[in-house]
Every structure is written in structure tokens, then in C-alpha cells.
């Protein structure tokens, strides 16, 4: 059990990034209603935060860059918890380092880019010479299940770690609803 074992102390921040440069004629870049960076990637970037910090976030905030068609080409989702925070960065026309960082009071976990495909993660401490490398085995198929399985491996949980619990799915759906309201407000003043 790595993340919640106390090895990195108390988890205070989870940051996940998933970006790619989609072509202009792709669905992600051409469909203002159902394309865009948030709807395309947030189910992946929010998953580590929800799995590690839980569903009881206190506030959600969106920073959104739109193109001239009203497609969100880069969106940051900030979640605030009582004693932690999370940032999910999503992009279809902005490229960034696609890594996952889980910051704690004694160290941090780094899953290098592309973290959603990685087969390893590292634990870093204040002493830069102290780095632990983990290469757990994965089972199951499907992108979301692999990410969830990866997070469960960081947590040290092997049984059914790939399953998204009902309350986690509901929390992520609530964030999606909040995004759709914010997008509508920013684009249409509603």
C-alpha cells in the first residue's frame, strides 16, 4: 500500500493531465456540444482524484479556453476538499506533460507521461537521491479500468480495484453537470 500507507504522508494534492493535439476535423475539435477536452478526457483525469481523495469535494472550479466554434480546447478542473485539492488538466488543442502527481506531506508519487499507459510509478522524497520505483502488474482491459487499476495499485489494493463505485460515478457525473452549466454560462450567458 503506497499512497495511503503513510509512505508519502497525508495526501494533499492530486494532479492529472491528459492532452493531445486533435485534428481540426476530429469530433473532439468540431462538435461544440459533445466534443472538447473536458468531455473527452475528464473521466480519466478526474478518476485519480476521486479514487484517492473521495467524493466529498467542497468546491469545483473550471478554467476553460474555447476556440471560435465554442469547443473547449483546454480545460482545468480544480477540486477543493477539506484538507486537500486536485487538478485535472484536459486538452485537445494544447499539449502538456501528461503525468500524474500525488503530493503528500512526506513525499510524492510520480507516474510519468503518459501516466494512463504507464506500467511504473516512482515515490520521491525530500532527499533527491531517495527514489523508490514500483512496477506492478495489471489485469483487465479498457482504458478507464486500467487507470482505475493503476490507482488501485498505487493504493496497494488488488481486489476489484478497477471497479468504479456508484458514489464515484455519481460524483463524476455531478462534476460533468457543473461543467456543462459553466460552459453554457460562459458561451451563452445563461
Language model feature labels by segment:
Residues 15-18, 64-66, 168:
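A general secondary-structure junction signal
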Residues 29, 40-47, 72, 142-145, ...:
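Generic recognition of short, well-ordered alpha-helical interface segments
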Residues 149-190:
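C-terminal helix-rich "cap/oligomerization" subdomain common to oxidoreductases
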